[in-house]
Each structure stands twice: as structure tokens, then as C-alpha cells.
A protein has these predicted regions:
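A structural-propensity feature for long, helix-poor, extended segments
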Residues: 29-63, 140-142, 147-149, 373-382
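Conserved alpha/beta-domain cores
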Residues: 58, 73-80, 84-395
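Residue-level signal for inorganic ion chemistry
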Residues: 16, 52, 259
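Generic short alpha-helical hydrophobic face used as a protein-protein interaction/packing hotspot
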Residues: 17-20, 56, 263
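Short, charged/polar, Gly/Pro-enriched secondary-structure boundary elements
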Residues: 60-62, 68-73
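Short glycine-rich, flexible loops that bind phosphorylated cofactors or substrates
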Residues: 10, 61, 346
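Conformationally flexible catalytic loops at phosphate/diphosphate-handling active centers
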Residues: 1-44
């Protein structure tokens, strides 16, 4: 993966690492022309279909196809070396995994659990996105429930796959986090597409073509209106995370049901399951109390339907300064904490990760204002101090 925007700690880079894909992110000297399917670097032009080779470790991109090799993670010498490290380490390593294939790769590398399954990534699949968009677009509770009911089997299947692969190891599933607008087409693109459709309609003469265009326009117009309503000045601090679960409680209910139906199903197959459900972006303890009541009621209902008891944990992600400072109150209702250091760093410094890494942050590091990129190296005095406070107060 090669991008002209973002940075090495941006979400795109994190996901690329999770997928095991070499990535060079934020190569600002390249210009990507999507219309003509090419990119330019200075006077050089690379067309779609030409080979380039990417070294995700050094950040170097080569023209042409270099000879490559797949690393052997089962090398006996490597396994021996890591076994020596295991004798002395005091920390365990859990992996990010959203799909069973990610979990399998993580186990091969020695992960002891799944520390973060981003449940929303599953909604972006082509067979699921229309149902999720339908849930967003409707104003009617019955239609929303129908859309969520259509999504339930997909989520259940994905969670069951993770539980099967992990075979009793802990799996932390984070409920939906991103703002809803991320699941809709870009507003500018929608306006452009609508303009194009209306021009085509103006020149259409065939009735069948006119009917098709009118249907497309109605659909796009509905998407545009909803995207306009959901548009926020600062979406990353808007309707997302725990706020979504409170705003649309049926969404939390569906996800919790999928988790526990999957757990019951896999336990019946003779496989031990240890789910841990995590609420994102908590800022006030009352948010957690609200979501815990919804979760416990649905989990109890599912376990009663299946005639079994699943041992699980309920926790939250500490990624806002207020959550860190009130961790003692939050800990009364959470069985574990996970620290979301990217959002915690953004909200502590008051800077946008993706914008800063290609802008002023470079100047800050080069001039010595900041000793290092705070998204790549933990800021011990600020963000680290908040984590320290949260741990001590939480305990």
C-alpha cells in the first residue's frame, strides 16, 4: 500500500500492519491522479498496471518488480530465540484482529489473545454495507430493526469464526466506534453524481432509461440528505463510540446478541470461549452504566435462550482525558481498561493525527519543539501521566 496522505501512525497504516501488508504512508512528494489512473513523482510517471516494489520497513519505494521472499516465522532458530525471551518477559502480546484470518496470522506470530476486534470493519463488506446504510437512512424504528436483523447473521458468523480460531484465548470485541457518516458516500461526490445524473436525465429520450435515472436520483438524493444531516464540524469528537450506542440502542443490542449467540454456538461445538466486550470513547461513568444495562439484559436473554452461561467481561477504552481522570468511578462499572493512545494523544495535545503528520508536526520535530512524534513514541509527561493516573485510580 502506498499513499500520498496520512502518516505512519495513521489509521490506514495501522490497518495495513494488521493485514500484514507492506505500506508506505504519507509520501507527500507523489501526486495520484485517479481519473487518469496514474501517479507522478517529479518528472516521472507511473501508470496503473506498472510494477513498483514497496519496502514497508525503510519506507523506500522502487520502480519495477524486485525479487522478494516470504519470511519463515516457523524458523527453528527464531522459535528458539523467542522461547528464551518468553522465560524473562513480564508482558503478554495480544493482537488486533477483525476477521478469523487475522486471528490465525496473529496466533502464528505468538499472540496470546485478541486485544482489539473492531466490529465496525465488518459492516464495510459489500454484502453488508447496504443493510447498514438502510439502518442509517430510515427514520422508522421498525425498518431500523429489520436492517439490523439482516446484519445480525453476518456479525454472528464473524465472531464465531474468531472464537473458533482463538480456542479459549481471550477476545476483546469493541462495539461500533466510527461516526455514521463514514458508512455513507462522500457528500461532495454525491452532489457531483447527482448533477451528472440530472444532466443525463435531461438528455434521455427512452422511457426505460428515464425511469432508471429517476430511481437512481431518488436514491442518491436520500443519501445526500442523510449525509448532510449527519455532517459534523468535528466528527471525531461527535456522534461516535458509546454515544452511538446510546443514540441508537438497537445497535448495541444487535452487536451484543451477535457476540453471545456466536459464543453459545461455539461452546456447543466443544470449544472454550472467553469474550470481552469493550465500550469505546467513554467520557462519563453514566455512559458506561447505560450501556452495561443494555448489554447485560441482552446477554442474559441470549444465554437463557440457549440454556447456558457464558463467562464474559465488560470494559471500556480510555481514550479521553476526562475518562483517565475519573477512572476510579469508571472502574466501579468496568472489569478492564484498554487505552486508546491515538485518540488520547489527539485529545491531550489538541491536534489531529492525520493532518499534523503531514503538516506542522514535521516542522515541530525538525526544529526540536517536540523531541519525537507523539503518535509514534508515547508522550510520557502528558499522555503517559494520564495513563498513570488512570491505572492508579482505576485500581
Amino acid at each position: 500500500i502506498l499513499t500520498s496522505r496520512g502518516g505512519r501512525t495513521s489509521h490506514a497504516a495501522l490497518v495495513a500492519r494488521q493485514f500484514g501488508k507492506p505500506a508506505v504512508v504519507g509520501a507527500s512528494t507523489i501526486t495520484i491522479d485517479l481519473t487518469n489512473r496514474l501517479m507522478t513523482i517529479g518528472s516521472q510517471t507511473i501508470h496503473e498496471g506498472q510494477w513498483i516494489s514497496i519496502d514497508g520497513t525503510t519506507g523506500v519505494v522502487y520502480e519495477g518488480q524486485l525479487e522478494t521472499m516470504v519470511p519463515d516465522i516457523k524458523d527453528p532458530l527464531l522459535i528458539k530465540l523467542l522461547s528464551w525471551a518468553d522465560e524473562f518477559r513480564t508482558l503478554g502480546v495480544w493482537a488486533n484482529a477483525d476477521y478469523p484470518r487475522d486471528a490465525s496470522r496473529a496466533l502464528e506470530y505468538g499472540a496470546q489473545g485478541i486485544g482489539l476486534c473492531r466490529s465496525e470493519h465488518m459492516f464495510f463488506e459489500t454484502d453488508r454495507l447496504p443493510h447498514f446504510q438502510r439502518m442509517i437512512l430510515t427514520d422508522y424504528p421498525v425498518e431500523r430493526k429489520e436492517a439490523l436483523a439482516a446484519l445480525l447473521p453476518f456479525q454472528r458468523q464473524d465472531f464465531a469464526g474468531l472464537f473458533r480460531v482463538m480456542k479459549g484465548r481471550p477476545v476483546i470485541i469493541r462495539l461500533i466506534d466510527p461516526p455514521l457518516h463514514e458508512f455513507l458516500p462522500d457528500l461532495v461526490e454525491l452532489v457531483s453524481e447527482l448533477a451528472d445524473l440530472k444532466i443525463r436525465l435531461k438528455h434521455a429520450t427512452d422511457m426505460a432509461a428515464i425511469d432508471t435515472l429517476l430511481a437512481e436520483i431518488r436514491q442518491k438524493e436520500q443519501l445526500r440528505k442523510r449525509a448532510q444531516i449527519l455532517r459534523e464540524a468535528n466528527p471525531m469528537l461527535g456522534l461516535r463510540g458509546v454515544r452511538l450506542g446510546i443514540y441508537i440502542p438497537e445497535l448495541t443490542t444487535m452487536q451484543v446478541r451477535a457476540i453471545f449467540e456466536a459464543a453459545c454456538m461455539v461452546v456447543k461445538e466443544g470449544i472454550d470461549v472467553h469474550p470481552e466486550v469493550m465500550i469505546p470513547l467513554t467520557s462519563h461513568v453514566n455512559e458506561l452504566v447505560h450501556q452495561r444495562s443494555v448489554l447485560e439484559a441482552e446477554a442474559k436473554a441470549v444465554m437463557s435462550e440457549h440454556g447456558m452461561e457464558i463467562v464474559y467481561k465488560f470494559g471500556t477504552m480510555i481514550e479521553l482525558p476526562r475518562a483517565a481522570l475519573t477512572a476510579d468511578r469508571i472502574a466501579e462499572h468496568a472489569e478492564f481498561f484498554s487505552f486508546g493512545t491515538n485518540d488520547l494523544t489527539q485529545t491531550t495535545f489538541g491536534i489531529s493525527r492525520d493532518d499534523a503528520e503531514t503538516g506542522f508536526l514535521i516542522e515541530y520535530m525538525e526544529s526540536g519543539i517536540l523531541p519525537a512524534n507523539p503518535f509514534a513514541m508515547l508522550d510520557r509527561d502528558g499522555v503517559g501521566a494520564l495513563i498513570d493516573i488512570a491505572v492508579k485510580r482505576g485500581r
